[in-house]
Amino acid sequence: MLEYINDPNDIKQIQPEDYKLLAKDIRRFLLRNVSRTGGHLASNLGIVELTMALHLVLDFPKDQLIFDVGHQSYVHKILTGRKNGFENLRQFHGMSGFPKRKESDCDAFHSGHSSMSLSAALGMVTARDINHTDETIVAVIGDGALSGGMAYEALNNMARLRKEKKNLIIILNDNKMSIAENVGGMSAYLNKVRTRKEYVEFKGNVEQSLLRIPGIGKELTTILKKSKDSIKQLFVPGMYFEDMGITYVGPIDGHNVPLMVDTLNRAKQLDEPIIIHVVTKKGKGYRPAEQNPAKFHGISPFSLKTGEVLKKSDNPSNTAVFSDTLIKEAKKDKKIVAVTAAMPDGTGLGKFKNHFPDRFFDVGIAEQHAVTFCAGMASRGLKPVFAVYSTFLQRGFDQILHDVAIGNYPVIFGLDRSGLVGADGETHQGIFDIPYLSIIPNMTVMAPINGRELSEMLKHTLHHAKGPTAIKYSRGEASSLYEDQFEELHYGKGQILKEGKEAVIIAVGNIFEEADKAEKILKEEGYEIGLVNPRYIKPFDQELIMKLSQTYDKIMIAEEGVLNGGFGMMVNEFLSEHDYKGEVRCLGIDDQFVEHGSVSELRRMLRIDGESIADSIRQWMKE
Protein backbone atom coordinates (compact mmCIF):
# COMPACT_ATOMS: atom_id res chain seq x y z
CA MET A 1 0.00 0.00 0.00
CA LEU A 2 2.91 2.35 0.61
CA GLU A 3 3.47 2.80 -3.14
CA TYR A 4 0.30 4.92 -3.20
CA ILE A 5 1.70 7.39 -0.66
CA ASN A 6 3.85 9.96 -2.45
CA ASP A 7 2.47 13.33 -1.40
CA PRO A 8 0.79 14.91 1.62
CA ASN A 9 -2.85 13.83 1.95
CA ASP A 10 -2.44 10.79 -0.36
CA ILE A 11 -3.47 8.63 2.58
CA LYS A 12 -7.02 9.93 2.22
CA GLN A 13 -7.35 7.79 -0.92
CA ILE A 14 -6.74 4.60 1.08
CA GLN A 15 -9.89 2.65 1.90
CA PRO A 16 -10.61 1.85 5.58
CA GLU A 17 -10.37 -1.89 4.95
CA ASP A 18 -6.76 -1.32 3.84
CA TYR A 19 -5.59 0.62 6.90
CA LYS A 20 -4.07 -2.47 8.53
CA LEU A 21 -2.17 -3.33 5.35
CA LEU A 22 -0.78 0.19 5.16
CA ALA A 23 0.28 0.07 8.82
CA LYS A 24 2.07 -3.21 8.18
CA ASP A 25 3.83 -1.75 5.12
CA ILE A 26 4.95 1.28 7.10
CA ARG A 27 6.43 -0.88 9.84
CA ARG A 28 8.29 -3.01 7.29
CA PHE A 29 9.60 0.16 5.67
CA LEU A 30 10.79 1.54 9.01
CA LEU A 31 12.50 -1.69 9.99
CA ARG A 32 14.23 -2.07 6.64
CA ASN A 33 15.58 1.47 6.64
CA VAL A 34 16.36 2.13 10.30
CA SER A 35 18.14 -1.22 10.62
CA ARG A 36 20.51 0.09 7.95
CA THR A 37 20.97 3.73 9.02
CA GLY A 38 20.21 3.59 12.71
CA GLY A 39 17.75 5.94 14.36
CA HIS A 40 14.78 6.16 16.69
CA LEU A 41 12.85 2.98 16.05
CA ALA A 42 10.66 1.82 18.95
CA SER A 43 8.72 5.07 19.32
CA ASN A 44 7.98 5.21 15.59
CA LEU A 45 6.82 1.60 15.45
CA GLY A 46 4.41 2.44 18.24
CA ILE A 47 2.91 5.55 16.67
CA VAL A 48 2.07 4.20 13.17
CA GLU A 49 -1.73 4.02 13.50
CA LEU A 50 -1.95 7.25 15.48
CA THR A 51 -0.03 9.14 12.79
CA MET A 52 -2.17 7.56 10.08
CA ALA A 53 -5.32 8.77 11.85
CA LEU A 54 -3.94 12.28 12.18
CA HIS A 55 -3.18 12.38 8.47
CA LEU A 56 -6.62 11.07 7.59
CA VAL A 57 -8.23 13.91 9.56
CA LEU A 58 -5.86 16.85 9.07
CA ASP A 59 -5.17 18.83 5.90
CA PHE A 60 -1.46 19.30 5.26
CA PRO A 61 0.29 21.68 5.14
CA LYS A 62 -2.57 23.97 6.20
CA ASP A 63 -3.14 22.27 9.54
CA GLN A 64 -0.35 22.34 12.09
CA LEU A 65 0.98 19.18 13.75
CA ILE A 66 3.64 19.54 16.44
CA PHE A 67 5.59 16.55 17.74
CA ASP A 68 7.06 16.88 21.21
CA VAL A 69 10.76 15.92 21.10
CA GLY A 70 10.22 14.96 17.46
CA HIS A 71 12.04 11.63 17.35
CA GLN A 72 8.69 9.93 16.65
CA SER A 73 8.06 11.89 13.42
CA TYR A 74 9.29 9.24 10.94
CA VAL A 75 5.78 8.05 10.03
CA HIS A 76 4.73 11.67 9.52
CA LYS A 77 7.65 12.10 7.13
CA ILE A 78 6.64 8.98 5.20
CA LEU A 79 3.07 10.23 4.84
CA THR A 80 4.15 13.69 3.67
CA GLY A 81 6.10 12.53 0.62
CA ARG A 82 9.56 11.99 2.12
CA LYS A 83 9.89 8.22 2.08
CA ASN A 84 12.77 8.41 -0.42
CA GLY A 85 14.71 10.47 2.10
CA PHE A 86 15.00 7.47 4.40
CA GLU A 87 17.89 6.17 2.31
CA ASN A 88 19.98 8.92 3.93
CA LEU A 89 18.16 9.29 7.23
CA ARG A 90 20.36 11.20 9.73
CA GLN A 91 23.27 11.04 7.29
CA PHE A 92 25.40 14.04 6.33
CA HIS A 93 23.28 16.33 4.10
CA GLY A 94 20.50 13.73 4.31
CA MET A 95 17.06 13.84 5.92
CA SER A 96 16.89 14.85 9.56
CA GLY A 97 15.63 12.46 12.20
CA PHE A 98 13.54 15.28 13.68
CA PRO A 99 10.90 17.68 12.32
CA LYS A 100 12.52 20.50 10.40
CA ARG A 101 10.62 23.41 8.90
CA LYS A 102 13.16 24.00 6.15
CA GLU A 103 12.80 20.35 5.15
CA SER A 104 9.01 20.44 4.63
CA ASP A 105 6.04 22.80 4.94
CA CYS A 106 4.33 19.91 6.72
CA ASP A 107 6.72 20.21 9.66
CA ALA A 108 4.99 22.92 11.66
CA PHE A 109 7.69 23.37 14.30
CA HIS A 110 11.23 22.07 14.75
CA SER A 111 11.85 19.98 17.85
CA GLY A 112 14.44 17.82 19.54
CA HIS A 113 14.09 18.54 23.24
CA SER A 114 11.24 17.50 25.48
CA SER A 115 8.06 19.08 26.85
CA MET A 116 7.94 22.04 24.45
CA SER A 117 5.02 21.11 22.18
CA LEU A 118 2.18 22.45 24.33
CA SER A 119 3.74 25.90 24.65
CA ALA A 120 4.40 26.07 20.91
CA ALA A 121 0.88 24.89 20.12
CA LEU A 122 -0.66 27.46 22.45
CA GLY A 123 1.38 30.16 20.73
CA MET A 124 0.10 28.97 17.36
CA VAL A 125 -3.50 29.02 18.58
CA THR A 126 -3.02 32.61 19.72
CA ALA A 127 -1.51 33.55 16.35
CA ARG A 128 -4.34 31.77 14.52
CA ASP A 129 -6.94 33.88 16.26
CA ILE A 130 -5.09 37.16 15.85
CA ASN A 131 -4.53 36.35 12.16
CA HIS A 132 -8.19 35.25 11.72
CA THR A 133 -7.27 31.90 10.13
CA ASP A 134 -8.96 28.55 10.70
CA GLU A 135 -6.29 25.84 10.71
CA THR A 136 -6.50 22.96 13.17
CA ILE A 137 -3.59 22.80 15.60
CA VAL A 138 -2.55 19.50 17.18
CA ALA A 139 0.26 18.74 19.62
CA VAL A 140 1.45 15.17 20.17
CA ILE A 141 3.16 14.68 23.53
CA GLY A 142 4.25 11.46 25.20
CA ASP A 143 3.56 10.49 28.77
CA GLY A 144 7.28 10.78 29.45
CA ALA A 145 7.49 14.33 28.08
CA LEU A 146 4.45 15.25 30.16
CA SER A 147 6.64 14.85 33.25
CA GLY A 148 8.61 17.94 32.20
CA GLY A 149 7.82 21.16 34.05
CA MET A 150 7.39 23.21 30.89
CA ALA A 151 4.41 21.05 29.91
CA TYR A 152 2.69 21.89 33.21
CA GLU A 153 3.34 25.59 32.67
CA ALA A 154 1.65 25.36 29.27
CA LEU A 155 -1.32 23.42 30.65
CA ASN A 156 -1.78 26.06 33.32
CA ASN A 157 -1.76 28.84 30.72
CA MET A 158 -3.95 26.81 28.37
CA ALA A 159 -6.90 26.75 30.74
CA ARG A 160 -7.97 30.18 29.44
CA LEU A 161 -8.87 28.66 26.07
CA ARG A 162 -12.10 27.19 27.40
CA LYS A 163 -13.36 30.62 28.44
CA GLU A 164 -12.21 32.06 25.13
CA LYS A 165 -13.89 29.20 23.23
CA LYS A 166 -10.74 28.26 21.30
CA ASN A 167 -9.91 24.81 20.00
CA LEU A 168 -6.60 23.05 20.56
CA ILE A 169 -6.15 19.30 20.30
CA ILE A 170 -3.54 17.56 22.44
CA ILE A 171 -2.74 13.92 21.80
CA LEU A 172 -1.30 12.26 24.88
CA ASN A 173 0.61 9.32 23.41
CA ASP A 174 0.80 7.01 26.39
CA ASN A 175 3.26 4.16 25.84
CA LYS A 176 4.32 4.00 29.50
CA MET A 177 7.85 5.10 28.56
CA SER A 178 10.01 8.05 27.61
CA ILE A 179 13.40 6.53 26.78
CA ALA A 180 13.40 4.30 29.82
CA GLU A 181 10.37 3.49 31.96
CA ASN A 182 8.53 6.52 33.26
CA VAL A 183 8.70 7.56 36.89
CA GLY A 184 6.85 9.96 39.16
CA GLY A 185 3.37 11.08 40.06
CA MET A 186 2.08 11.77 36.54
CA SER A 187 3.12 8.29 35.44
CA ALA A 188 1.28 6.78 38.40
CA TYR A 189 -1.76 8.93 37.67
CA LEU A 190 -1.93 7.88 34.03
CA ASN A 191 -1.60 4.28 35.07
CA LYS A 192 -4.73 4.74 37.19
CA VAL A 193 -6.54 6.32 34.25
CA ARG A 194 -5.57 3.46 31.97
CA THR A 195 -7.10 0.96 34.33
CA ARG A 196 -10.32 2.86 35.06
CA LYS A 197 -12.08 2.45 31.71
CA GLU A 198 -15.42 2.13 33.48
CA TYR A 199 -15.55 5.92 33.80
CA VAL A 200 -15.61 6.45 30.04
CA GLU A 201 -18.29 3.79 29.61
CA PHE A 202 -20.30 5.13 32.58
CA LYS A 203 -20.28 8.71 31.32
CA GLY A 204 -21.41 7.81 27.82
CA ASN A 205 -24.14 5.43 28.96
CA VAL A 206 -25.62 7.82 31.53
CA GLU A 207 -25.70 10.81 29.19
CA GLN A 208 -27.32 8.81 26.39
CA SER A 209 -29.96 7.44 28.77
CA LEU A 210 -30.82 10.88 30.13
CA LEU A 211 -31.17 12.37 26.66
CA ARG A 212 -33.88 9.81 25.88
CA ILE A 213 -36.15 11.06 28.71
CA PRO A 214 -38.96 13.10 27.07
CA GLY A 215 -39.10 16.76 27.99
CA ILE A 216 -36.45 16.88 30.69
CA GLY A 217 -33.62 14.82 29.15
CA LYS A 218 -31.52 17.78 27.99
CA GLU A 219 -31.98 19.61 31.28
CA LEU A 220 -30.89 16.59 33.30
CA THR A 221 -27.87 16.12 31.04
CA THR A 222 -26.89 19.74 31.67
CA ILE A 223 -27.21 19.20 35.41
CA LEU A 224 -25.07 16.07 35.09
CA LYS A 225 -22.37 17.97 33.22
CA LYS A 226 -22.37 20.72 35.83
CA SER A 227 -21.86 18.14 38.55
CA LYS A 228 -19.46 15.99 36.56
CA ASP A 229 -16.51 16.83 38.78
CA SER A 230 -17.96 14.95 41.73
CA ILE A 231 -18.98 11.99 39.55
CA LYS A 232 -15.53 11.79 37.99
CA GLN A 233 -13.91 11.73 41.39
CA LEU A 234 -15.70 8.45 42.04
CA PHE A 235 -14.18 6.78 39.00
CA VAL A 236 -10.92 8.57 38.11
CA PRO A 237 -9.29 10.15 41.17
CA GLY A 238 -8.26 13.75 40.48
CA MET A 239 -9.31 14.06 36.84
CA TYR A 240 -6.24 16.24 36.56
CA PHE A 241 -6.81 17.64 33.07
CA GLU A 242 -10.49 18.43 33.55
CA ASP A 243 -9.62 20.22 36.77
CA MET A 244 -7.22 22.34 34.71
CA GLY A 245 -10.07 23.35 32.39
CA ILE A 246 -9.15 21.00 29.55
CA THR A 247 -11.62 18.42 28.28
CA TYR A 248 -10.32 14.87 28.65
CA VAL A 249 -11.23 11.93 26.40
CA GLY A 250 -9.84 8.45 26.82
CA PRO A 251 -8.03 6.29 27.22
CA ILE A 252 -8.56 4.93 23.70
CA ASP A 253 -6.74 2.29 21.67
CA GLY A 254 -3.95 4.02 19.78
CA HIS A 255 -3.76 1.19 17.26
CA ASN A 256 -7.43 1.45 16.19
CA VAL A 257 -7.41 3.82 13.21
CA PRO A 258 -11.21 4.18 12.68
CA LEU A 259 -11.77 4.88 16.38
CA MET A 260 -9.09 7.55 16.43
CA VAL A 261 -10.35 9.13 13.20
CA ASP A 262 -13.82 9.40 14.69
CA THR A 263 -12.46 10.85 17.94
CA LEU A 264 -10.29 13.40 16.13
CA ASN A 265 -13.13 14.54 13.89
CA ARG A 266 -15.31 15.11 16.95
CA ALA A 267 -12.48 16.95 18.69
CA LYS A 268 -12.13 19.35 15.76
CA GLN A 269 -15.70 20.51 16.29
CA LEU A 270 -15.15 21.62 19.88
CA ASP A 271 -14.56 25.24 20.82
CA GLU A 272 -12.30 24.37 23.73
CA PRO A 273 -8.98 22.61 24.40
CA ILE A 274 -9.13 18.82 24.51
CA ILE A 275 -6.70 16.09 25.52
CA ILE A 276 -7.15 12.75 23.79
CA HIS A 277 -5.45 10.05 25.84
CA VAL A 278 -4.19 7.40 23.41
CA VAL A 279 -2.57 4.18 24.62
CA THR A 280 0.08 2.69 22.31
CA LYS A 281 2.75 0.00 22.51
CA LYS A 282 6.31 1.17 22.01
CA GLY A 283 8.11 -1.06 19.50
CA LYS A 284 4.87 -2.60 18.18
CA GLY A 285 5.30 -5.10 15.36
CA TYR A 286 8.93 -6.03 16.01
CA ARG A 287 9.38 -8.45 18.87
CA PRO A 288 12.91 -7.41 19.95
CA ALA A 289 11.73 -3.79 20.19
CA GLU A 290 8.56 -4.76 22.07
CA GLN A 291 10.62 -6.76 24.56
CA ASN A 292 13.32 -4.12 24.99
CA PRO A 293 11.94 -0.72 23.89
CA ALA A 294 14.67 1.19 25.73
CA LYS A 295 17.36 -0.50 23.62
CA PHE A 296 15.49 0.31 20.41
CA HIS A 297 14.61 3.85 21.39
CA GLY A 298 17.68 5.10 19.56
CA ILE A 299 19.79 2.41 17.98
CA SER A 300 22.77 2.05 15.65
CA PRO A 301 22.50 -0.12 12.51
CA PHE A 302 21.39 -3.59 13.57
CA SER A 303 20.53 -7.07 12.30
CA LEU A 304 16.81 -7.40 11.59
CA LYS A 305 17.03 -11.11 12.27
CA THR A 306 18.65 -10.93 15.70
CA GLY A 307 18.10 -7.34 16.77
CA GLU A 308 21.78 -7.04 17.64
CA VAL A 309 23.83 -3.95 16.77
CA LEU A 310 26.14 -4.70 13.84
CA LYS A 311 29.27 -2.88 14.98
CA LYS A 312 30.27 -3.29 18.58
CA SER A 313 33.56 -2.09 19.97
CA ASP A 314 35.46 -4.05 22.58
CA ASN A 315 36.75 -0.79 24.02
CA PRO A 316 34.82 0.90 26.83
CA SER A 317 32.91 4.09 26.11
CA ASN A 318 33.44 7.31 28.04
CA THR A 319 29.99 6.73 29.49
CA ALA A 320 31.04 3.29 30.78
CA VAL A 321 34.29 4.65 32.23
CA PHE A 322 32.39 7.35 34.09
CA SER A 323 29.75 4.92 35.36
CA ASP A 324 32.23 2.24 36.44
CA THR A 325 34.37 4.77 38.29
CA LEU A 326 31.33 6.17 40.05
CA ILE A 327 30.31 2.69 41.20
CA LYS A 328 33.80 1.92 42.53
CA GLU A 329 33.93 5.14 44.50
CA ALA A 330 30.36 4.72 45.78
CA LYS A 331 31.33 1.37 47.28
CA LYS A 332 33.83 3.24 49.45
CA ASP A 333 31.74 6.34 50.17
CA LYS A 334 28.08 6.08 51.18
CA LYS A 335 27.53 9.78 50.65
CA ILE A 336 27.82 9.44 46.88
CA VAL A 337 24.43 9.53 45.14
CA ALA A 338 23.56 9.48 41.43
CA VAL A 339 20.83 11.39 39.59
CA THR A 340 19.47 11.08 36.05
CA ALA A 341 16.68 12.86 34.19
CA ALA A 342 14.91 9.89 32.57
CA MET A 343 18.09 8.53 30.97
CA PRO A 344 19.56 5.82 33.20
CA ASP A 345 20.81 3.74 30.28
CA GLY A 346 22.08 6.57 28.07
CA THR A 347 24.12 8.05 30.91
CA GLY A 348 25.33 4.68 32.18
CA LEU A 349 23.64 5.06 35.56
CA GLY A 350 21.52 1.95 35.10
CA LYS A 351 24.45 -0.06 36.46
CA PHE A 352 24.72 2.27 39.45
CA LYS A 353 21.03 1.67 40.15
CA ASN A 354 21.62 -2.09 40.22
CA HIS A 355 24.35 -1.67 42.84
CA PHE A 356 22.81 1.11 44.92
CA PRO A 357 19.05 1.35 44.35
CA ASP A 358 18.64 3.51 47.47
CA ARG A 359 21.22 6.02 46.25
CA PHE A 360 19.95 6.27 42.67
CA PHE A 361 17.33 8.82 41.64
CA ASP A 362 15.55 9.10 38.30
CA VAL A 363 13.60 12.36 38.45
CA GLY A 364 11.97 12.04 35.02
CA ILE A 365 12.38 14.58 32.24
CA ALA A 366 13.03 17.38 34.71
CA GLU A 367 16.53 18.82 34.40
CA GLN A 368 15.70 22.00 36.30
CA HIS A 369 14.38 20.02 39.24
CA ALA A 370 17.32 17.60 39.03
CA VAL A 371 19.86 20.41 39.46
CA THR A 372 18.19 21.92 42.52
CA PHE A 373 17.43 18.47 43.91
CA CYS A 374 21.20 17.87 43.79
CA ALA A 375 21.84 21.23 45.45
CA GLY A 376 19.54 20.26 48.31
CA MET A 377 21.37 16.98 48.85
CA ALA A 378 24.77 18.66 48.64
CA SER A 379 23.69 21.25 51.21
CA ARG A 380 23.23 18.39 53.69
CA GLY A 381 26.58 16.75 53.09
CA LEU A 382 25.85 14.27 50.30
CA LYS A 383 27.90 14.06 47.11
CA PRO A 384 25.40 14.18 44.24
CA VAL A 385 26.47 13.32 40.71
CA PHE A 386 24.07 14.40 37.96
CA ALA A 387 24.91 12.53 34.75
CA VAL A 388 23.26 14.34 31.86
CA TYR A 389 23.77 15.01 28.16
CA SER A 390 25.43 18.36 27.59
CA THR A 391 22.57 19.63 25.43
CA PHE A 392 19.99 18.83 28.11
CA LEU A 393 21.84 20.54 30.96
CA GLN A 394 21.16 23.80 29.11
CA ARG A 395 17.59 23.46 30.36
CA GLY A 396 18.76 23.86 33.96
CA PHE A 397 21.03 26.89 33.51
CA ASP A 398 19.28 29.18 36.00
CA GLN A 399 19.24 26.43 38.62
CA ILE A 400 22.99 25.87 38.19
CA LEU A 401 23.67 29.57 38.59
CA HIS A 402 21.16 30.44 41.31
CA ASP A 403 20.60 27.26 43.31
CA VAL A 404 24.01 25.58 43.04
CA ALA A 405 26.74 28.12 42.33
CA ILE A 406 25.65 30.93 44.66
CA GLY A 407 25.66 28.45 47.53
CA ASN A 408 28.89 26.93 46.17
CA TYR A 409 27.48 23.43 46.66
CA PRO A 410 29.73 20.56 45.50
CA VAL A 411 27.40 19.14 42.86
CA ILE A 412 29.14 17.14 40.14
CA PHE A 413 27.81 17.35 36.60
CA GLY A 414 28.84 14.49 34.32
CA LEU A 415 28.40 16.11 30.90
CA ASP A 416 27.95 13.19 28.55
CA ARG A 417 27.78 13.77 24.76
CA SER A 418 29.82 16.94 25.07
CA GLY A 419 31.04 18.22 21.72
CA LEU A 420 29.70 16.94 18.41
CA VAL A 421 27.28 14.04 18.78
CA GLY A 422 26.64 13.42 15.09
CA ALA A 423 23.40 12.08 13.66
CA ASP A 424 20.92 13.80 15.99
CA GLY A 425 21.93 17.20 14.66
CA GLU A 426 21.36 20.77 15.79
CA THR A 427 19.20 20.02 18.80
CA HIS A 428 21.64 17.57 20.35
CA GLN A 429 25.16 18.85 19.63
CA GLY A 430 26.91 19.54 22.93
CA ILE A 431 28.84 22.55 21.68
CA PHE A 432 27.65 25.30 24.02
CA ASP A 433 28.70 23.99 27.44
CA ILE A 434 32.01 25.83 27.81
CA PRO A 435 30.50 29.32 27.32
CA TYR A 436 27.40 28.81 29.44
CA LEU A 437 29.23 27.10 32.32
CA SER A 438 32.40 29.20 32.32
CA ILE A 439 30.57 32.46 32.98
CA ILE A 440 29.26 31.13 36.32
CA PRO A 441 31.27 32.09 39.44
CA ASN A 442 32.45 29.17 41.63
CA MET A 443 32.07 26.72 38.72
CA THR A 444 34.91 24.38 37.79
CA VAL A 445 34.94 22.90 34.28
CA MET A 446 37.19 19.99 33.29
CA ALA A 447 37.78 18.11 30.04
CA PRO A 448 39.73 14.81 29.89
CA ILE A 449 41.57 13.63 26.78
CA ASN A 450 41.41 9.90 27.54
CA GLY A 451 39.61 7.32 29.64
CA ARG A 452 42.12 7.24 32.46
CA GLU A 453 42.01 10.99 32.84
CA LEU A 454 38.20 10.92 32.90
CA SER A 455 38.25 8.35 35.68
CA GLU A 456 40.84 10.27 37.69
CA MET A 457 38.98 13.56 37.25
CA LEU A 458 35.81 12.03 38.66
CA LYS A 459 37.66 10.48 41.61
CA HIS A 460 39.55 13.70 42.33
CA THR A 461 36.34 15.74 42.22
CA LEU A 462 34.41 13.34 44.45
CA HIS A 463 37.05 13.61 47.15
CA HIS A 464 38.31 17.18 46.81
CA ALA A 465 35.61 19.38 45.26
CA LYS A 466 34.83 22.56 47.20
CA GLY A 467 32.11 23.73 44.81
CA PRO A 468 30.20 22.78 41.64
CA THR A 469 32.18 20.91 38.98
CA ALA A 470 31.40 19.87 35.42
CA ILE A 471 33.37 17.11 33.72
CA LYS A 472 32.69 17.10 29.98
CA TYR A 473 33.26 14.01 27.86
CA SER A 474 32.27 12.89 24.40
CA ARG A 475 30.05 10.17 23.04
CA GLY A 476 31.74 6.97 21.94
CA GLU A 477 34.91 5.11 22.84
CA ALA A 478 37.21 6.31 25.55
CA SER A 479 40.56 7.23 24.04
CA SER A 480 43.76 5.65 25.32
CA LEU A 481 45.88 8.39 23.80
CA TYR A 482 48.78 9.45 26.07
CA GLU A 483 47.50 7.37 29.00
CA ASP A 484 51.09 6.26 29.56
CA GLN A 485 52.04 9.89 30.20
CA PHE A 486 49.37 10.47 32.82
CA GLU A 487 50.42 12.80 35.62
CA GLU A 488 48.65 13.27 38.93
CA LEU A 489 45.89 15.85 38.84
CA HIS A 490 46.36 19.19 40.56
CA TYR A 491 43.52 21.68 40.71
CA GLY A 492 43.57 24.16 37.85
CA LYS A 493 46.73 22.73 36.28
CA GLY A 494 47.30 21.58 32.70
CA GLN A 495 49.94 19.33 31.16
CA ILE A 496 52.51 19.74 28.39
CA LEU A 497 52.56 16.46 26.48
CA LYS A 498 54.91 17.38 23.66
CA GLU A 499 57.43 20.19 23.31
CA GLY A 500 57.76 22.01 20.00
CA LYS A 501 59.52 24.91 18.29
CA GLU A 502 57.43 26.58 15.58
CA ALA A 503 54.03 26.53 17.30
CA VAL A 504 51.99 24.91 20.04
CA ILE A 505 48.44 23.53 19.98
CA ILE A 506 46.37 23.73 23.15
CA ALA A 507 43.61 21.20 22.48
CA VAL A 508 40.57 20.82 24.71
CA GLY A 509 39.21 17.39 25.63
CA ASN A 510 37.98 15.19 22.82
CA ILE A 511 39.45 17.36 20.04
CA PHE A 512 42.91 16.48 21.36
CA GLU A 513 42.96 13.36 19.19
CA GLU A 514 42.65 15.56 16.08
CA ALA A 515 45.40 17.88 17.29
CA ASP A 516 47.62 14.83 17.80
CA LYS A 517 46.94 13.74 14.20
CA ALA A 518 47.85 17.23 13.00
CA GLU A 519 51.10 17.17 14.97
CA LYS A 520 52.08 13.84 13.42
CA ILE A 521 51.28 15.09 9.89
CA LEU A 522 53.36 18.21 10.38
CA LYS A 523 56.22 16.28 11.97
CA GLU A 524 56.62 14.32 8.74
CA GLU A 525 56.96 17.66 6.97
CA GLY A 526 59.70 18.82 9.32
CA TYR A 527 57.70 20.99 11.70
CA GLU A 528 58.01 20.63 15.46
CA ILE A 529 54.67 21.42 17.05
CA GLY A 530 54.00 21.35 20.77
CA LEU A 531 50.90 19.73 22.29
CA VAL A 532 49.22 20.85 25.50
CA ASN A 533 46.32 19.30 27.38
CA PRO A 534 44.72 22.10 29.45
CA ARG A 535 42.69 19.65 31.59
CA TYR A 536 40.98 22.53 33.38
CA ILE A 537 38.92 24.95 31.31
CA LYS A 538 37.86 26.96 34.32
CA PRO A 539 40.00 27.90 36.06
CA PHE A 540 42.60 27.42 33.35
CA ASP A 541 46.29 27.17 34.14
CA GLN A 542 47.47 30.78 33.85
CA GLU A 543 51.01 29.91 34.86
CA LEU A 544 51.21 27.35 32.05
CA ILE A 545 49.77 29.81 29.53
CA MET A 546 52.37 32.42 30.50
CA LYS A 547 55.12 29.83 30.08
CA LEU A 548 53.84 28.99 26.60
CA SER A 549 53.69 32.68 25.69
CA GLN A 550 57.37 33.00 26.55
CA THR A 551 58.27 29.94 24.45
CA TYR A 552 56.14 30.22 21.29
CA ASP A 553 55.37 32.99 18.82
CA LYS A 554 52.36 31.06 17.55
CA ILE A 555 49.72 29.59 19.86
CA MET A 556 46.77 27.69 18.42
CA ILE A 557 43.78 26.79 20.59
CA ALA A 558 41.46 24.05 19.34
CA GLU A 559 38.10 23.08 20.82
CA GLU A 560 35.01 21.17 19.69
CA GLY A 561 32.63 23.90 20.73
CA VAL A 562 31.51 27.37 19.77
CA LEU A 563 34.26 29.96 19.59
CA ASN A 564 32.13 32.77 20.99
CA GLY A 565 32.72 32.60 24.73
CA GLY A 566 34.82 29.47 24.38
CA PHE A 567 38.13 28.42 25.89
CA GLY A 568 40.13 30.02 23.08
CA MET A 569 38.48 33.37 23.63
CA MET A 570 39.24 33.21 27.37
CA VAL A 571 42.91 32.37 26.81
CA ASN A 572 43.29 34.92 24.02
CA GLU A 573 41.88 37.64 26.25
CA PHE A 574 44.26 36.63 29.04
CA LEU A 575 47.27 36.78 26.71
CA SER A 576 46.17 40.15 25.35
CA GLU A 577 45.91 41.53 28.88
CA HIS A 578 49.48 40.33 29.49
CA ASP A 579 50.84 41.98 26.32
CA TYR A 580 51.64 38.79 24.44
CA LYS A 581 53.49 39.83 21.29
CA GLY A 582 52.98 36.62 19.35
CA GLU A 583 49.95 35.40 17.42
CA VAL A 584 46.97 33.44 18.71
CA ARG A 585 44.52 31.58 16.50
CA CYS A 586 41.42 29.78 17.69
CA LEU A 587 39.87 26.81 15.93
CA GLY A 588 36.35 25.77 16.78
CA ILE A 589 32.79 26.29 15.66
CA ASP A 590 31.69 29.65 14.30
CA ASP A 591 28.36 31.29 15.13
CA GLN A 592 26.09 28.54 13.80
CA PHE A 593 24.00 25.49 14.60
CA VAL A 594 25.62 22.29 13.34
CA GLU A 595 23.54 19.88 11.26
CA HIS A 596 23.47 16.10 11.46
CA GLY A 597 26.15 13.78 10.09
CA SER A 598 28.91 11.59 11.44
CA VAL A 599 31.34 13.24 13.84
CA SER A 600 34.21 12.77 11.38
CA GLU A 601 32.22 14.39 8.55
CA LEU A 602 31.21 17.30 10.73
CA ARG A 603 34.76 17.87 11.92
CA ARG A 604 35.94 18.01 8.31
CA MET A 605 33.16 20.44 7.42
CA LEU A 606 34.07 22.66 10.38
CA ARG A 607 37.81 22.30 9.66
CA ILE A 608 38.67 20.96 13.10
CA ASP A 609 39.81 17.50 11.96
CA GLY A 610 43.49 16.55 11.99
CA GLU A 611 44.10 17.30 8.30
CA SER A 612 42.44 20.71 8.54
CA ILE A 613 44.28 21.66 11.72
CA ALA A 614 47.56 20.71 10.06
CA ASP A 615 46.63 22.74 6.98
CA SER A 616 45.75 25.78 9.10
CA ILE A 617 49.15 25.66 10.80
CA ARG A 618 50.91 25.01 7.50
CA GLN A 619 49.31 28.09 5.92
CA TRP A 620 50.03 30.08 9.06
CA MET A 621 53.72 29.26 8.78
CA LYS A 622 53.79 30.60 5.23
CA GLU A 623 52.30 33.98 6.12
What are these model-predicted stretches?
Residues 13, 175-322:
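Long, well-ordered, tryptophan-enriched scaffold segments
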Residues 64, 280-394, 399-409, 490, ...:
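Non-catalytic terminal/interface segments that mediate subunit docking, oligomerization
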Residues 1-78, 240-242, 246-257, 277-280:
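N-terminal amphipathic, basic-rich helices that act as targeting or association modules
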Residues 85-95, 160-175, 198-201, 405-417:
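A glycine-rich helix N-cap at a beta->alpha junction
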Residues 301-305, 309-314, 422-424, 444, ...:
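Peripheral docking tails and interdomain loops at the edges
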Residues 220-288, 410-415, 434-484, 610-623:
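Structural signature of the thiamine diphosphate
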Residues 40-164, 318, 336, 340-341, ...:
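Cofactor-binding active-site loop characterized by glycine-rich and histidine/acidic residues
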Residues 262-265, 297-298, 307, 317-332, ...:
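Glycine-/acidic-rich phosphate or pyrophosphate-binding loops and their flanking alpha/beta elements
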